[in-house]
Amino acid sequence: MHLYGDCAAERKQEKNNNMAKKKIYENYIGYTILKPIVDWNLKHSYRKVEVRGKENIPTDGAVIIAPNHCNTLMDALVILRAFDSPTVFGARADIFNNKFIGKIMTFLRILPMVRQRDGLRNVLKNNETQEIIVETLENRVRFCMFPEGRHRPAHSLQSLGKGTFRAALAANAKFGDRFPVYIVPTGLEYGDYFRYRSTSLVTFGKPINVTGFVKGQDVDNEVKLIEPLRKELAARMSELFTYLKDGEQLHDKWALTKILATHQGVRYGDFGTSLHEGMLANREIAARIEKACEEKPEEMSELLEKVEKFEKKRRKEKISIYSFRKKNNVLNIAGESLAALIGLPYWIFSAIVSAPMWLTYNLLRSKTRDRAFHNTVGFGVKLALGIILFLIYTILAFCLLPWPFALAVSLLTIPSYSMFFDYNEGMRRFISDIRLMGEKGLRKSYKEIVKTFNKEF
């Protein structure tokens, strides 16, 4: 009797879960309240955020957003912020193994996506998930899937899985006669994958009309339909961020891209600059590098070896690549010193009031094996503690200080966490500028790499 009761309870729980999942696309008050808070914290997790190409997103059908996956949970969050209306996401199923986290993920409109490596028995669960995806799309709610399946902090693309295309074809089979199904290629570009308070650029490309594509084919075989769709999506995605071909020298090619970009004075994320224009400039440089690798592979291999040695030396000496684009003379150093002194009082204030956050961030970061999660940790800490600390400091300030001073303290606490990181980054680059002044050999290597590439390629 007890066993029967347990089974009945499990079936009831499973039924309730299925009902909840099937309504994952519907509006509910908790999500409506939380989304603006998440969006605000996401915006202030970066120095600069840009969204381009929203005019490319169709309004006459079902839409699947398909971005590259390079920065863990932050990839989903920057997509989420790009829209006012809800977006449902797919994520690795193993994240849902923890029941508490699974409930949070479901609350955030995230579905478990099982991969082949998870075993055949688990893969079969994707049939249920796919039904929910199709229902979501049928109700004209966007669904975001990362075709690569797993994240990798690199300016390239991994092989695209079949999940995105199977979902699109299943949706088209169910309601494609009523309205079309689209896959929108999307490019995500970050100023830095690992440093909190970098930059974020989202670019939506021209959509792939899956319904129109299927109508133009003479085959019903899913495999034969998926392969050309996969090639087309990969080609369009690679046009929306600084793309380099995958391979052993990928990181050296990216390092060379940054070297040439700093030499050309490409301003990426600086005040008054456009992230999109900076990305386009980087793409042109990357295209030149790929062309050189194809036309003169041996010469480029030698140059990339020099780049690798340069990078090892630069990182060992803790010198930022951005220090090379400036004339680090005494006058500039004096100006930077003055700016550091002016900002010091507020940095001290920020360091004190945001200490619970940045200490927690440093602790969690030290225990996070995958560096790609560092930005996610920084965001999570701000989201979890930011409002609580603001309320505590505001109450204390108005209890202990005259209201004008209390109001000032309250307002100054809002950007303190961001200011703390921005000042630290400024100081890191300032110290880097000073160090570079004493590194004649490194400056010489930098100039030789630039000269060699521009002369021979």
Model-derived segments and spans:
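Membrane-anchoring hydrophobic helices of lipid-metabolizing enzymes
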Residues: 19-66, 72-78, 83, 107-109, ...
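Long, positively charged, glycine-interspersed low-complexity recognition regions
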Residues: 343, 347-455
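Basic/hydrophobic alpha-helical interface regions
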Residues: 47, 81-87, 130, 159
